[in-house]
Amino acid sequence: MKPWPQLPSDPRLYYFAVPNEIFHSEINASEFAILAYLFSRQMKELPPTNLMTVYKNLGVSRNTMKKYARILESRGLISLRRDKRFLRASVSMRDTITLTDALKVRVGHFFPLPNSVFGFGLSVGEIAVYGYLLYREDRESYECWPSYRTIGAALCMSRNTVMKYVHRLEEKEFIVTEPTQVRRMDGSKWNGNLKYRIRPIQSVVKRWNEKQAEKAKREQKLLRAMKIAEHRPGFTIQPGIPERRPQQRC
């Protein structure tokens, strides 16, 4: 089990910087998540890692990891150093992966992404949509209102796929959405884009850990009930269903 997301003692280390240029060319969710993870390691000044480590932290399949590592290398965004033990394979999970100088963090040309974003078990699609909203976010109001189509065009996703990930992020309390209306020249009102408010990562981490603690308590309670039921014939325990004493026959 992964450790629960924790915040560093220094608030300045809550986030790492991702260059705006990452969205200036075509990129999909898996490619964004891989690059973002490498930027997080770079900011922490961690040593180079291999594909296996990235794969475990992003939750993608091995084939997906290898596929997009090859694509990112061909675009000059990452460098792969081959493991001598696996030279026959085109790409090995033991190959070392590092960022190149093609994408650089420049003053005033980056957006922040929370260091703890990889500890919540988010899918690469959720990470990518969350990252794009942070890219578009107003730094004073913490709001933005890109359309589903705009988000999808930036991440090579369909409108329905974007909607799915937005709803998941809202359910997990990373964002809050609010419908808007626009007034046309003829005075009629039409539904506008959703307005997104990005919740502070401090509150997200706190709420996440509270939910995990509640879940752990429920599981412990169920485990104790199951142990008791093993020694008391006639009892059945099912998750989410309160136990009932069987009726006695006359």
Kindly label every feature range from the protein language model.
Residues M1-C250:
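Electropositive, intrinsically flexible nucleic-acid-contacting patches
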